[in-house]
From Swiss-Prot:
Disulfide bonds join C100-C180, C441-C444. The gene is HRH1. It is a multi-pass membrane protein. Gene3D superfamilies: Rhodopsin 7-helix transmembrane proteins (1.20.1070.10). This is Histamine H1 receptor. One of its GO terms (biological process) is positive regulation of vasoconstriction.
């Protein structure tokens, strides 16, 4: 594939009959515009790289692909564009063959690396959406870095034909000293083959991947709506027995990810908390909460799930018990009762791991409660069934909640990928269509149109860093902070 370079603009064989000579004064406005584009491209991509380096929130696996794309775009803006402008001004190449080969190599390598970076970014988003939980274990910075290095290695393979084409051919190509062009500029089969491998095939695969991503996200959203419509929402779940007395919902209920807490009441008929003789650190048996006629948990505090384990529930005396085991964590008391040890927010990874630890203890426990109030007994079928039901529901909703968080993030990432792909295709496809036409019809080249398609492809490197803050709130905030822009 002849990735964008301006050699065709001056190649008599490729553009013969349509070539026009432009005077330098006429070129100056165009040179100013193109130079501005080059400077903006360099500045924006440097801003992206600095933002990722300086902001910890941007240190993610997915942004490694963005860094790769930004490096490729930076090379286009800092090396390829300026030398193209210089070649356009001179109307002939007078900088020598070594510098010509360097420019051609940077042009082909950077443009291919940009295409491949978008491609592997698309694959990453596809696997994140299609296999979220499985791919999370596989999706590491080491593997992502290896994939990126592989993409750049394939891109650098362009150096072989650029520098050594004549070494692989018996016939030596005629080289024009005042032109900067590859030795295979007139080899149709090679250019068509590489165009298919480097652009058309990756583009078709990316469109297929993105269609799958779109369908998966859409299907997940429909599934979530169906679940939310048929089951109580995650925030509405309460640990309570299914009896008529406990059906009335109390105002001000808090999140289900909070551990049970009841204040003792002076008057009868209220709930009673049996205070253990040991401190929470010293407790070896579960802390048991008793509850009277209302049959409903008063308050839940945010605990990591691995310290919460459901025990058997006593039957009789209109009480229901929920036990909290401390085998995996320490509880901290305050004047109001039990509180958390500072876990107000549960991360996605914690929930994935903790949901496995949220389970019923293996052994039955018998514990005395307040005098005259009843006893916690093993073998309570009704209570045990309720505990099992509650555990299954909490586990199911925790997984749905984690899956929802992950899919929410991936939906935003898919949106970002959609904009990147749209810009990529719109900017590059005119050049490659025109390129295929020229490959089969050497007299069909129009100098001005071909130059326009080349620079349209280059402008893709300018647009990419503008897309990131539009689709990513962290990029937007970081850009504003770096540029000292107030919201």
């Amino acid at each position: 594939m002849s990735l964008p370079n301006s050699s065709c603009l001056l190649e008599d064989k490729m553009c013969e009959g349509n070539k026009t000579t432009m005077a330098s004064p006429q070129l100056m406005p165009l040179v100013v515009v193109l130079s501005t584009i080059s400077l903006v491209t360099v500045g924006l991509n440097l801003l992206v790289l600095y933002a990722v380096r300086s902001e910890r929130k941007l240190h993610t696996v997915g942004n490694l692909y963005i860094v790769s794309l930004s490096v490729a775009d930076l090379i286009v803006g800092a090396v390829v564009m300026p030398m193209n402008i210089l070649y356009l001004l001179m109307s002939k190449w007078s900088l020598g063959r070594p510098l010509c080969l360097f420019w051609l190599s940077m042009d082909y390598v950077a443009s291919t690396a940009s295409i491949f970076s978008v491609f592997i970014l698309c694959i990453d988003r596809y696997r994140s959406v299609q296999q979220p939980l499985r791919y999370l274990k596989y999706r590491t910075k080491t593997r992502a870095s290896a994939t990126i290095l592989g993409a750049w290695f394939l891109s650098f393979l362009w150096v072989i034909p650029i520098l050594g084409w004549n070494h692989f051919r018996q016939q030596i190509s005629v080289r024009r000293e005042d032109k900067c062009e590859t030795d295979f500029y007139d080899v149709t089969w090679f250019k068509v083959m590489t165009a298919i491998i480097n652009f058309y095939l990756p583009t078709l695969l990316m469109l297929w991947f993105y269609a799958k991503i779109y369908k998966a996200v859409q299907k997940h959203c429909q599934h979530r709506e169906l679940i939310n419509g048929s089951l109580p929402s995650f925030s509405e779940i309460k640990l309570r027995p299914e009896n008529p007395k406990g059906d009335a919902k109390k105002p001000g209920k808090e999140s289900p990810w909070e551990v049970l807490k009841r204040k003792p009441k002076d008057a009868g008929g209220g709930s009673v908390l049996k205070s253990p003789s040991q401190t929470p650190k010293e407790m070896k048996s579960p802390v048991v909460f008793s509850q009277e006629d209302d049959g409903e948990v008063d308050k839940l505090h945010c605990f990591p799930l691995d310290i919460v384990q459901m025990q058997t529930v006593a039957e009789g005396s209109s009480r229901d018990y929920v036990a909290i085991n401390q085998s995996h964590g320490q509880l901290k008391t305050d004047e109001q009762g039990l509180n958390t040890h500072g876990a107000s927010e549960i991360s996605e990874d914690q929930m994935l791991g903790d949901s496995q630890s949220f389970s019923r203890t293996d052994s039955d426990t018998t514990t005395e409660t307040a005098p005259g109030k009843g006893k916690l007994r093993s073998g309570s079928n009704t209570g045990l069934d309720y505990i099992k039901f509650t555990w299954k529901r909490l586990r199911s909703h925790s997984r749905q909640y984690v899956s929802g968080l992950h899919m929410n993030r991936e939906r935003k990432a898919a949106k970002q990928l959609g904009f990147i792909m749209a810009a990529f295709i719109l900017c590059w496809i005119p050049y490659f269509i025109f390129f295929m036409v020229i490959a089969f019809c050497k007299n069909c080249c129009n100098e001005h149109l071909h130059m326009f398609t080349i620079w349209l492809g280059y402008i893709n490197s300018t647009l990419n860093p503008l897309i990131y803050p539009l689709c990513n709130e962290n990029f937007k905030k970081t850009f504003k902070r770096i540029l000292h822009i107030r919201s």
